[in-house]
């Protein structure tokens, strides 16, 4: 998985409903990632994305709006190894 890849992300909103959208993987490192999406994602929710070979999972630490969309910072789960 490379930066600028399109990925399908999923999370549960505060009421427990499954949500999902397409995102652009802006940045990734061993401790987390930054995704660009078209809608806000609540802070603290668990979010995941990936392919059959690798599933990424973590928690939303920030979600800020910029001119081209929302940027979501994800801290990987402590058990996750990239």
Describe the function of each predicted region.
Residues 1-82:
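Structured alpha-helical
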